[in-house]
Amino acid sequence: MAEELQLVSFTLGSEEFGVDIGMVQEIVRMPDITKVPRAPEFVEGVVNLRGKIIPVVDLRRRFLLPVTAATKSTRIIVATLGGRTVGMIVDTVSEVLRLDAASVEATPEMVASQIDSSFLKGIAKLEGRLLILLDLGLVLDTDQVKALPAIA
């Protein structure tokens, strides 16, 4: 039997991304974010999520994409990275998908040149669209994840 992947899909601008659902704890609406002095540029700040303070990363900034204002559709994907809870701002969360692992192909060089290719697991072909698969464990390298709780 072919291996099946379960992914949460989301958008940043015109691109659609997917992340392993196993790393996602929850998806929340955009709360008020408290800025943190001297945090890395891609760290938007921290939020209080049911009594727990978690750092929030703006994935647009992390991927060096143009930054836009939050909308009613903006969400924070709360994930566990390196044993730490981190929120990641995305434009919209689309759906939960199941797909055959065999449908994932290597990331084309043109796509990899726009986003650090070390963040990418590959590209999945879906009905008429492409989904860029991210490796959340690499979106924030180990040292950056270790530093995040110190920010919060």
Where do the PLM segments sit?
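An acidic, low-aromatic, low-complexity terminal/linker signal
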Residues: 1-152
